[in-house]
């Protein structure tokens, strides 16, 4: 995959990566309590072909999506995924366990 994914970040502290579900985008995470961003840096990544993230026709499966998200994510973070985002987070953990802190 060659396209860069869209991401939104806010807050300071240990990194949390937020991955939305199928047919959604980063906006689903904007309703999280502001208090969470006080103690963490939240990075919501839009999956390939969702929201402002472009689709790459070379995408073949979850591992490709996970690689794209790893490229957009902070160096080490706790990943939180909703639905499809959870599957992508699990794939990322299998590909690069040293990049995920939880």
Predicted regions and their residues:
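Active-site loop signature of alpha/beta-hydrolase-fold enzymes
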Residues: 24-25, 50-53, 87
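Conserved hydrolase catalytic core segment
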Residues: 76-102
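Histidine-centered active-site/metal-ligand motif
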Residues: 20, 40, 50
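Active-site loop/oxyanion-hole signature of alpha/beta-hydrolase fold enzymes
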Residues: 31-34, 43-80, 94
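Alpha/beta-hydrolase fold catalytic core
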Residues: 1-16, 34-41, 71-76
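Structural cue for short, hydrophobic secondary-structure segments
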Residues: 18-21, 44
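Active-site glycine-rich loops that stabilize anionic/oxyanionic intermediates
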Residues: 13, 21-24, 83
């Amino acid at each position: 995959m060659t396209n860069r994914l869209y991401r939104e970040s806010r807050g300071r502290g240990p990194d949390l990566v937020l991955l939305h579900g199928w047919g959604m985008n980063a906006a689903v995470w904007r309703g999280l309590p502001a208090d969470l961003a006080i103690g963490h840096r939240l990075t919501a990544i839009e999956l390939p072909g969702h929201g402002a993230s472009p689709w790459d026709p070379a995408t073949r499966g979850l591992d490709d999506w996970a690689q794209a998200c790893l490229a957009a994510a902070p160096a080490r973070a706790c990943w939180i995924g909703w639905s499809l985002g959870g599957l992508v987070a699990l794939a990322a953990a299998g590909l690069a366990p040293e990049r995920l802190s939880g």
